[in-house]
Amino acid sequence: MTKSIVFSGVQPSGELTIGNYLGALRNWVTLQDDYDCLFCIVDLHAITVRQDPIALRKSTLDVLALYLACGIDPNKSTIFIQSQVPEHSQLAWVLNCYTYFGEMGRMTQFKDKSARYEENVNVGLFTYPVLMAADILLYQANQVPVGDDQKQHLEITRDIANRFNTLYGKKDAEGKLIESVFTVPECFIAKACARVMSLLEPTKKMSKSDDNRNNVIGLLEDPKAVAKKIKRAMTDSDEPPVIKYDQKNKAGVSNLLDILAAITGKSMVELEAEFEGKMYGHLKTEVADQVMAMLTGLQERYQRFRQDEALLEKIYRDGAEKARMRAKKTLDEVYKLIGFVG
Protein backbone atom coordinates (compact mmCIF):
# COMPACT_ATOMS: atom_id res chain seq x y z
CA MET A 1 0.00 0.00 0.00
CA THR A 2 1.36 3.44 -0.99
CA LYS A 3 1.98 5.69 1.98
CA SER A 4 0.42 9.14 2.13
CA ILE A 5 3.01 11.88 1.48
CA VAL A 6 3.65 14.47 4.21
CA PHE A 7 5.73 17.62 3.68
CA SER A 8 6.77 20.18 6.26
CA GLY A 9 9.65 22.48 7.06
CA VAL A 10 11.15 25.04 9.43
CA GLN A 11 13.02 28.26 8.69
CA PRO A 12 16.63 28.43 9.93
CA SER A 13 16.14 31.97 11.22
CA GLY A 14 16.13 32.48 14.95
CA GLU A 15 16.55 29.79 17.58
CA LEU A 16 13.85 27.11 17.55
CA THR A 17 11.63 27.12 20.64
CA ILE A 18 9.84 24.54 22.73
CA GLY A 19 6.78 25.64 20.77
CA ASN A 20 8.45 24.38 17.58
CA TYR A 21 9.33 21.13 19.34
CA LEU A 22 6.09 20.37 21.21
CA GLY A 23 3.89 21.72 18.42
CA ALA A 24 5.70 20.34 15.37
CA LEU A 25 9.01 18.46 15.51
CA ARG A 26 7.93 15.93 18.11
CA ASN A 27 4.83 15.13 16.07
CA TRP A 28 6.88 14.72 12.89
CA VAL A 29 8.80 11.91 14.58
CA THR A 30 5.59 9.95 15.13
CA LEU A 31 4.66 10.20 11.43
CA GLN A 32 7.76 8.53 10.04
CA ASP A 33 6.62 4.90 10.17
CA ASP A 34 3.18 5.45 8.68
CA TYR A 35 3.80 8.23 6.14
CA ASP A 36 6.24 9.05 3.35
CA CYS A 37 7.78 12.12 5.01
CA LEU A 38 9.82 14.97 3.57
CA PHE A 39 11.20 17.41 6.12
CA CYS A 40 12.86 20.52 4.74
CA ILE A 41 14.98 23.34 6.16
CA VAL A 42 13.42 26.23 4.25
CA ASP A 43 16.33 28.62 3.87
CA LEU A 44 14.88 30.30 0.76
CA HIS A 45 12.00 31.50 2.91
CA ALA A 46 14.42 32.75 5.56
CA ILE A 47 15.99 35.38 3.29
CA THR A 48 12.71 37.30 2.90
CA VAL A 49 14.11 38.99 6.03
CA ARG A 50 17.75 40.13 5.99
CA GLN A 51 20.09 37.43 7.31
CA ASP A 52 23.76 37.50 8.21
CA PRO A 53 25.35 34.94 5.80
CA ILE A 54 27.62 33.35 8.41
CA ALA A 55 24.79 33.14 10.93
CA LEU A 56 22.42 31.64 8.33
CA ARG A 57 24.87 28.87 7.42
CA LYS A 58 25.39 28.05 11.09
CA SER A 59 21.69 28.16 11.86
CA THR A 60 20.90 25.85 8.94
CA LEU A 61 23.22 23.19 10.34
CA ASP A 62 21.88 23.85 13.85
CA VAL A 63 18.35 23.09 12.65
CA LEU A 64 19.51 19.93 10.88
CA ALA A 65 21.20 18.71 14.07
CA LEU A 66 18.03 19.53 16.02
CA TYR A 67 15.93 17.55 13.55
CA LEU A 68 18.15 14.54 14.24
CA ALA A 69 18.23 15.14 18.00
CA CYS A 70 14.42 15.23 18.06
CA GLY A 71 14.33 11.79 16.43
CA ILE A 72 13.81 12.51 12.74
CA ASP A 73 15.56 9.61 11.03
CA PRO A 74 17.20 10.06 7.59
CA ASN A 75 16.65 6.34 6.98
CA LYS A 76 12.90 6.84 7.32
CA SER A 77 12.39 10.40 6.08
CA THR A 78 13.86 12.63 3.39
CA ILE A 79 15.68 15.47 5.17
CA PHE A 80 17.05 18.25 2.97
CA ILE A 81 17.88 21.93 2.61
CA GLN A 82 15.49 23.83 0.34
CA SER A 83 18.11 25.85 -1.58
CA GLN A 84 19.89 22.64 -2.61
CA VAL A 85 16.86 21.57 -4.66
CA PRO A 86 16.57 24.28 -7.38
CA GLU A 87 13.25 22.87 -8.56
CA HIS A 88 11.60 24.73 -5.66
CA SER A 89 12.52 28.10 -7.17
CA GLN A 90 11.79 26.94 -10.71
CA LEU A 91 8.28 25.76 -9.89
CA ALA A 92 7.65 28.84 -7.75
CA TRP A 93 8.26 31.07 -10.79
CA VAL A 94 5.76 29.09 -12.86
CA LEU A 95 3.16 29.23 -10.07
CA ASN A 96 3.70 32.99 -9.71
CA CYS A 97 2.32 33.26 -13.22
CA TYR A 98 -0.87 31.45 -12.16
CA THR A 99 -1.41 33.43 -8.96
CA TYR A 100 -3.19 36.77 -8.78
CA PHE A 101 -1.83 39.92 -7.20
CA GLY A 102 -5.01 40.38 -5.17
CA GLU A 103 -4.68 36.91 -3.66
CA MET A 104 -1.23 37.74 -2.31
CA GLY A 105 -2.38 41.13 -1.06
CA ARG A 106 -4.96 39.44 1.18
CA MET A 107 -2.40 37.31 3.02
CA THR A 108 -2.50 38.38 6.66
CA GLN A 109 1.06 37.24 7.38
CA PHE A 110 2.37 39.58 4.67
CA LYS A 111 0.50 42.46 6.27
CA ASP A 112 1.93 41.59 9.68
CA LYS A 113 5.52 41.13 8.50
CA SER A 114 5.52 44.16 6.23
CA ALA A 115 4.49 46.26 9.21
CA ARG A 116 7.24 44.74 11.35
CA TYR A 117 9.97 44.90 8.69
CA GLU A 118 8.83 48.10 6.98
CA GLU A 119 12.41 48.99 6.00
CA ASN A 120 12.59 45.79 3.88
CA VAL A 121 9.18 45.03 2.34
CA ASN A 122 10.54 43.01 -0.57
CA VAL A 123 8.79 41.10 -3.35
CA GLY A 124 9.99 37.80 -1.87
CA LEU A 125 8.02 38.54 1.30
CA PHE A 126 4.96 39.29 -0.83
CA THR A 127 5.20 36.07 -2.88
CA TYR A 128 6.30 33.88 0.06
CA PRO A 129 3.04 31.83 -0.12
CA VAL A 130 3.72 30.92 -3.77
CA LEU A 131 7.12 29.48 -2.86
CA MET A 132 5.41 27.58 -0.05
CA ALA A 133 2.90 26.25 -2.59
CA ALA A 134 5.80 25.10 -4.79
CA ASP A 135 7.44 23.39 -1.80
CA ILE A 136 4.30 21.34 -1.22
CA LEU A 137 3.07 20.68 -4.77
CA LEU A 138 6.52 19.68 -6.03
CA TYR A 139 6.32 16.45 -4.01
CA GLN A 140 2.61 15.77 -4.58
CA ALA A 141 2.12 16.01 -0.82
CA ASN A 142 -1.20 14.69 0.46
CA GLN A 143 -0.98 16.26 3.89
CA VAL A 144 0.83 19.23 5.41
CA PRO A 145 1.17 19.80 9.17
CA VAL A 146 0.76 23.56 9.59
CA GLY A 147 0.14 25.93 12.46
CA ASP A 148 -2.70 28.43 12.58
CA ASP A 149 -0.46 31.13 11.12
CA GLN A 150 0.12 29.05 7.97
CA LYS A 151 -3.42 27.79 7.30
CA GLN A 152 -4.18 30.69 4.96
CA HIS A 153 -1.06 29.82 2.96
CA LEU A 154 -2.19 26.20 2.65
CA GLU A 155 -5.56 27.41 1.36
CA ILE A 156 -3.89 29.46 -1.38
CA THR A 157 -1.77 26.39 -2.21
CA ARG A 158 -4.99 24.44 -2.73
CA ASP A 159 -6.42 27.24 -4.88
CA ILE A 160 -3.30 27.34 -7.07
CA ALA A 161 -3.29 23.55 -7.45
CA ASN A 162 -6.96 23.46 -8.43
CA ARG A 163 -6.48 26.32 -10.89
CA PHE A 164 -3.53 24.60 -12.57
CA ASN A 165 -5.33 21.24 -12.62
CA THR A 166 -8.37 22.83 -14.29
CA LEU A 167 -6.17 24.35 -16.99
CA TYR A 168 -3.82 21.46 -17.67
CA GLY A 169 -5.22 18.28 -16.12
CA LYS A 170 -6.39 15.42 -18.32
CA LYS A 171 -10.12 15.58 -19.11
CA ASP A 172 -12.63 13.13 -20.55
CA ALA A 173 -14.80 13.72 -23.63
CA GLU A 174 -17.25 15.75 -21.54
CA GLY A 175 -14.52 18.00 -20.18
CA LYS A 176 -14.52 16.45 -16.70
CA LEU A 177 -11.14 16.35 -14.95
CA ILE A 178 -9.94 12.74 -14.71
CA GLU A 179 -6.23 13.20 -13.95
CA SER A 180 -4.69 16.05 -11.99
CA VAL A 181 -1.25 17.56 -12.41
CA PHE A 182 -0.92 18.38 -8.72
CA THR A 183 -2.24 16.57 -5.67
CA VAL A 184 -4.44 19.00 -3.73
CA PRO A 185 -3.04 18.86 -0.18
CA GLU A 186 -5.01 18.65 3.04
CA CYS A 187 -4.11 20.15 6.40
CA PHE A 188 -2.71 17.48 8.71
CA ILE A 189 -4.27 17.67 12.15
CA ALA A 190 -2.10 15.98 14.77
CA LYS A 191 -3.86 14.02 17.51
CA ALA A 192 -1.73 15.65 20.19
CA CYS A 193 -0.38 19.02 19.16
CA ALA A 194 0.60 21.53 21.84
CA ARG A 195 0.14 25.22 21.20
CA VAL A 196 2.71 27.01 23.35
CA MET A 197 2.11 30.67 24.10
CA SER A 198 4.41 33.54 25.05
CA LEU A 199 5.54 33.44 28.69
CA LEU A 200 4.83 37.11 29.45
CA GLU A 201 2.07 37.67 26.88
CA PRO A 202 0.15 34.37 27.01
CA THR A 203 -2.58 35.46 24.61
CA LYS A 204 -0.09 35.34 21.70
CA LYS A 205 1.82 32.37 20.32
CA MET A 206 5.43 31.83 21.37
CA SER A 207 7.56 32.92 18.40
CA LYS A 208 11.25 32.37 17.71
CA SER A 209 11.34 35.85 16.15
CA ASP A 210 10.00 37.60 19.28
CA ASP A 211 12.24 40.56 20.15
CA ASN A 212 11.57 40.05 23.87
CA ARG A 213 13.55 36.89 24.63
CA ASN A 214 11.87 36.59 28.05
CA ASN A 215 8.76 35.47 26.15
CA VAL A 216 10.57 32.57 24.54
CA ILE A 217 12.12 29.25 25.58
CA GLY A 218 14.81 28.30 23.06
CA LEU A 219 15.66 24.64 22.55
CA LEU A 220 19.37 25.41 22.91
CA GLU A 221 19.12 27.77 25.87
CA ASP A 222 20.82 27.05 29.17
CA PRO A 223 18.21 25.03 31.13
CA LYS A 224 18.90 27.01 34.31
CA ALA A 225 18.24 30.30 32.50
CA VAL A 226 15.05 28.78 31.14
CA ALA A 227 13.92 27.88 34.66
CA LYS A 228 14.31 31.54 35.69
CA LYS A 229 12.18 32.64 32.73
CA ILE A 230 9.43 30.18 33.64
CA LYS A 231 9.39 31.40 37.23
CA ARG A 232 8.80 34.93 35.90
CA ALA A 233 6.01 33.79 33.57
CA MET A 234 2.70 35.62 33.79
CA THR A 235 -0.12 34.00 35.78
CA ASP A 236 -2.82 36.21 37.35
CA SER A 237 -3.77 37.98 40.56
CA ASP A 238 -6.53 35.64 41.77
CA GLU A 239 -6.59 35.40 45.55
CA PRO A 240 -6.44 32.68 46.64
CA PRO A 241 -4.62 31.31 43.57
CA VAL A 242 -6.64 28.85 41.48
CA ILE A 243 -4.82 26.48 39.15
CA LYS A 244 -7.30 25.45 36.50
CA TYR A 245 -7.44 25.36 32.72
CA ASP A 246 -9.31 28.40 31.40
CA GLN A 247 -7.72 29.96 28.31
CA LYS A 248 -10.07 32.94 28.26
CA ASN A 249 -9.80 34.06 31.87
CA LYS A 250 -6.53 32.44 33.00
CA ALA A 251 -4.32 32.50 29.90
CA GLY A 252 -1.00 32.43 31.76
CA VAL A 253 -1.91 29.52 34.02
CA SER A 254 -3.43 27.66 31.08
CA ASN A 255 -0.22 28.08 29.07
CA LEU A 256 1.86 26.58 31.88
CA LEU A 257 -0.60 23.70 32.16
CA ASP A 258 -0.44 23.16 28.39
CA ILE A 259 3.35 22.93 28.51
CA LEU A 260 3.22 20.53 31.45
CA ALA A 261 0.57 18.35 29.81
CA ALA A 262 2.55 18.18 26.57
CA ILE A 263 5.73 17.05 28.33
CA THR A 264 4.24 14.66 30.90
CA GLY A 265 1.31 13.29 28.90
CA LYS A 266 -1.03 13.99 31.81
CA SER A 267 -4.58 15.20 31.18
CA MET A 268 -5.85 18.56 32.36
CA VAL A 269 -8.14 16.79 34.83
CA GLU A 270 -5.12 15.04 36.36
CA LEU A 271 -3.08 18.23 36.52
CA GLU A 272 -5.88 20.30 38.03
CA ALA A 273 -6.33 17.65 40.73
CA GLU A 274 -2.58 17.51 41.35
CA PHE A 275 -2.33 21.27 41.88
CA GLU A 276 -5.60 21.82 43.71
CA GLY A 277 -5.03 24.20 46.62
CA LYS A 278 -1.42 24.89 45.61
CA MET A 279 0.29 28.17 44.81
CA TYR A 280 1.35 29.37 41.35
CA GLY A 281 4.95 28.95 42.47
CA HIS A 282 4.40 25.20 42.81
CA LEU A 283 3.11 25.03 39.23
CA LYS A 284 6.01 27.10 37.88
CA THR A 285 8.57 24.95 39.71
CA GLU A 286 7.12 21.75 38.27
CA VAL A 287 6.98 23.20 34.75
CA ALA A 288 10.57 24.43 35.08
CA ASP A 289 11.78 21.01 36.30
CA GLN A 290 10.05 19.18 33.45
CA VAL A 291 11.28 21.62 30.79
CA MET A 292 14.84 21.48 32.14
CA ALA A 293 14.85 17.67 32.04
CA MET A 294 13.48 17.66 28.49
CA LEU A 295 16.00 20.25 27.25
CA THR A 296 18.97 18.57 28.93
CA GLY A 297 18.38 15.30 27.08
CA LEU A 298 17.62 17.03 23.80
CA GLN A 299 20.72 19.24 24.00
CA GLU A 300 22.99 16.27 24.74
CA ARG A 301 21.76 14.53 21.58
CA TYR A 302 22.02 17.78 19.62
CA GLN A 303 25.67 18.31 20.60
CA ARG A 304 26.61 14.81 19.42
CA PHE A 305 25.13 15.46 15.98
CA ARG A 306 26.26 19.09 15.70
CA GLN A 307 29.90 18.19 16.33
CA ASP A 308 29.90 15.68 13.46
CA GLU A 309 29.75 18.02 10.45
CA ALA A 310 30.80 15.24 8.07
CA LEU A 311 27.67 13.31 9.06
CA LEU A 312 25.49 16.40 8.69
CA GLU A 313 26.89 17.05 5.21
CA LYS A 314 26.25 13.46 4.14
CA ILE A 315 22.67 13.63 5.41
CA TYR A 316 21.79 16.91 3.67
CA ARG A 317 23.51 15.93 0.41
CA ASP A 318 21.84 12.50 0.33
CA GLY A 319 18.52 14.12 1.22
CA ALA A 320 18.84 16.70 -1.56
CA GLU A 321 19.60 13.98 -4.09
CA LYS A 322 16.51 11.99 -3.07
CA ALA A 323 14.34 15.11 -3.07
CA ARG A 324 15.58 16.22 -6.50
CA MET A 325 14.70 12.88 -8.07
CA ARG A 326 11.10 13.40 -6.99
CA ALA A 327 10.99 17.13 -7.67
CA LYS A 328 12.35 16.78 -11.21
CA LYS A 329 9.54 14.41 -12.15
CA THR A 330 6.89 16.99 -11.22
CA LEU A 331 8.74 19.93 -12.74
CA ASP A 332 9.37 18.11 -16.03
CA GLU A 333 5.65 17.38 -16.33
CA VAL A 334 4.74 21.00 -15.56
CA TYR A 335 7.23 22.34 -18.11
CA LYS A 336 5.87 19.99 -20.76
CA LEU A 337 2.26 20.99 -20.07
CA ILE A 338 2.85 24.74 -20.25
CA GLY A 339 4.78 24.45 -23.50
CA PHE A 340 8.45 24.70 -22.60
CA VAL A 341 10.83 22.96 -25.00
CA GLY A 342 12.21 19.79 -23.38
Swiss-Prot record:
**Top-rank EC class of the record's enzyme:** ligase
Chain sites annotated for binding L-tryptophan = D135
Per UniProt, ATP binds at Q11, P12, S13, G19, N20, G147, D148, D149, V196, K205, M206, S207, K208, S209
Swiss-Prot/TrEMBL catalytic activity = tRNA(Trp) + L-tryptophan + ATP = L-tryptophyl-tRNA(Trp) + AMP + diphosphate + H(+)
Q: What are the EC numbers?
A: 6.1.1.2
Q: What is its main location?
A: cytoplasm
An example GO BP is: tryptophanyl-tRNA aminoacylation
| Keyword terms | Aminoacyl-tRNA synthetase, ATP-binding, Cytoplasm, Ligase, Nucleotide-binding, Protein biosynthesis
Q: Does the keyword Signal apply?
A: no
| Motif 'HIGH' region: where in chain | 12-20
Entries under PROSITE patterns matching the protein: AA_TRNA_LIGASE_I (PS00178)
Q: Where is this motif: 'KMSKS' region?
A: 205-209
Which cellular component terms (GO) are annotated to the entry?
Answer: cytosol
Q: List the molecular function annotations (GO) for this entry.
A: ATP binding; tryptophan-tRNA ligase activity
Report the locations given in the UniProt record: Cytoplasm
User: Known NCBIfam families for this protein?
Assistant: trpS
The annotated subunit structure for this chain is: Homodimer.
What is this protein's function?
Catalyzes the attachment of tryptophan to tRNA(Trp).
PANTHER family in UniProt: TRYPTOPHAN--TRNA LIGASE, MITOCHONDRIAL
Q: Which family does it belong to?
A: Belongs to the class-I aminoacyl-tRNA synthetase family.
Give the protein's recorded name: Tryptophan--tRNA ligase
> Per the UniProt entry, what species is this protein from, by scientific name?
Haemophilus ducreyi (strain 35000HP / ATCC 700724)
